[in-house]
């Protein structure tokens, strides 16, 4: 049996991964997300964009995978499982999943905004949250930026290609913790259904996918995923 997992913000929320509006220190809540997550915002103030992403980078580095992440990693030891995520954290990887196809980039990867070469050098320290941080500079003179898909940017070719390939050939797709409204990722469950796959939605709240999903489970990732593989035969009867 081949399984694809499509994960969204809900699974990471259980690990207390902060969102934009979760800013406890008050530095970022006053900014429009577009100012910090777009090429226009980057061009206007790269130091502020770096401050925002470096703050998130270090916050996420200090949280841990939850039972949902660990369950998915355990599945990979038993059956063929492809992990596709809209999240920019590394919690799937730290739980043991591999490979993980990041559709929206990663807080833990960086590249030059000018020549696109990957950056593996040191990051600025952030012992306390600050509003602006000088970006590292590439050998070509360009500024290093987070490898995140910003507003208006296309998805990275390779992760998207692999996500589509896995979706087209899967037997079961588990859609966990995603609102199912952000395209093109929201189109993957539709593609799976069109190819005859079973689509299982795991979300405490209904989403636009609910009416079309084969099965909808109104639980969180940590509640539903640890026992889901064993429950599949009964669920699919």
Curated annotation (Swiss-Prot):
Substrate binds at residues 53, 56. This is NAD-dependent protein deacylase. Zn(2+) binds at residues 112, 115, 138, 140. The active site is at 104 (proton acceptor). It is found in: Cytoplasm. It is an enzyme of class 2 (transferase). GO terms for molecular function: histone deacetylase activity, NAD-dependent; NAD+ binding; protein-malonyllysine demalonylase activity; protein-succinyllysine desuccinylase activity; zinc ion binding. Residues 1-235 form the Deacetylase sirtuin-type domain. NAD(+) binds at residues 8-28, 86-89, 177-179, 203-205, 221. 2 residues (Tyr-53 and Arg-56) present in a large hydrophobic pocket are probably involved in substrate specificity. They are important for desuccinylation activity, but dispensable for deacetylation activity. Its EC number is 2.3.1.286. Keywords: Cytoplasm, Metal-binding, NAD, Transferase, Zinc. Binds 1 zinc ion per subunit.
